[in-house]
UniProtKB/Swiss-Prot annotation:
It holds the Pfam family RRM_1. This is Heterogeneous nuclear ribonucleoprotein A3 homolog 1. The lineage of its organism: Eukaryota, Metazoa, Chordata, Craniata, Vertebrata. GO terms for molecular function: mRNA 3'-UTR binding. One of its GO terms (biological process) is mRNA splicing, via spliceosome. Residues 207-218, 334-373 have a biased composition (Gly residues). Residues 1-25, 196-218, 319-373 are annotated as: Disordered. Residues 27-110, 118-206 form the RRM domain. The keyword RNA-binding applies. Residues 319-333 have a biased composition (Low complexity). One of its GO terms (cellular component) is catalytic step 2 spliceosome.
Length: 373
């Protein structure tokens, strides 16, 4: 297929010729806001100042060959990516551009994947995990502003999750793009922390993409169909009424549940994390956050139940850390492809994923307890 075609935008999972510890997704930057005069050569000339580029492309309309206003550069190692991001702001052909770490195909389908935020949600916090464990881990990615370990106001017991706010959105992008996180010896989920308003924005943006052009393939349709379902249709999706991850979710609210979950800010249950608490009776399955019975991504729903079997790779997120079962899938955006359903160079909120560059911050509100450090 010619350079810049639709299907060659996605790398192979083995990422041949490079250290497997540094998959292509981690070495790739999305460059938004390009001048329509910018070419592959002028883009390369600028960004190769910070390292060796293994690929560089300005995305163009396949019919008119006109620039879509964005492109991608891929470095030979993550260290070069970090150096490039540390050199912001970047100006190419007289225009200030916006570099962001590329988002994988599966992550692009998740709420807020392209929103710009400085706060992360950390799930799976165990009772023996203290603030300094979170700080030690998070400081390796960037400068921390605050850490909030969420607790039950009455008992003082940890709720099982925390929030970390950094001074730079790129630190958040860097940490969430990685698939595995182990804090104080425990497997943890790390994702962007979105306010209720940001969740609504993300849902609306995915809804505009709608239909069969989204990333989840058959039946996924986040933001469209039945109430913005993040999963295979039906009730109980992300932000719907039953648990966190799709058709069989439990917990009467759960993470993101109807009115009393993570983005319910107090709601009916009055707790930040839903009536039975974060991971209560079914954060993606029956009991608990990652217990072997259902677990994170367990059968029948789970987190990101967007393939036909209704789970992410068929594996549990349990103490053995088999997140997604066998191996990571696509390593992230390559040349070409439709990022926001109907078009990849769309107007309004941005050309990439229909939502890059929006908003900031997250969390807040709700009748929960927490210690801020």
């Amino acid at each position: 297929m010619p350079r810049g075609g639709m299907d060659d935008h996605w790398p192979s999972s083995d990422d041949q010729g490079h250290d497997p510890k540094e998959p292509e997704q981690l070495r790739k930057l999305f460059i938004g806001g390009l001048s329509f005069e910018t070419t592959d050569d002028s883009l390369r000339e600028h960004f190769e100042q910070w390292g060796k580029l293994t690929d560089c492309v300005v995305m163009r309309d396949p019919q008119t060959k006109r620039s879509r206003g964005f492109g991608f550069v891929t470095y030979s190692c993550v260290e070069e990516v970090d150096a490039s991001m540390s050199a912001r702001p970047h100006k190419v052909d007289g225009r200030v551009v916006e570099p962001k770490r590329a988002v994988s195909r599966e992550d692009s389908a998740r709420p807020g994947a392209h929103l710009t935020v400085k706060k992360i949600f950390v799930g799976g916090i165990k009772e023996d995990t203290e603030e300094y464990h979170l700080r030690d881990y998070s400081e390796s990615y960037g400068k921390i502003e605050t850490i909030e370990v969420m607790e039950d106001r009455q008992s003082g017991k940890k709720r099982g999750f925390a929030f970390v706010t950094f001074d730079d959105h790129d630190t958040v992008d860097k940490i969430v793009v990685q698939k595995y996180h182990t804090i104080n010896g425990h497997n943890c989920e790390v994702k962007k922390a979105l306010s209720k308003q940001e969740m609504q924005t993300a849902s609306a943006q995915r809804g505009r993409g709608g239909g069969g052009s989204n990333f989840m393939g058959r039946g996924g349709n986040y933001g469209g169909g039945d109430g913005g379902n993040f999963g295979r249709g039906g009730g109980g999706g992300f932000g719907n009424r039953g648990g966190y991850g799709g058709g069989g979710g439990r917990g009467g609210g759960g993470y993101g549940g109807g009115g009393d979950g993570y983005n319910g800010f107090g709601g009916d249950g009055g707790n930040y994390g839903g009536g039975p608490g974060y991971g209560g009776r079914g954060y993606g399955g029956s009991p608990g956050y990652g217990n072997q019975g259902g677990g994170y991504g367990g059968g029948g729903g789970g987190y990101d139940g967007y393939n036909e079997s209704g789970n992410f790779g068929g594996g549990n997120y349990n103490d053995f850390g088999n997140y997604g079962g066998q191996q990571q899938s696509n390593y992230g955006p390559m040349k070409g492809g439709s990022f926001s359903g109907r078009s990849s160079g769309g107007s309004g909120s941005g050309p990439y994923g229909g939502g890059y560059g929006s908003g900031g911050g997250g969390g807040g509100g709700g009748s929960y307890g927490g210690r801020r450090f």
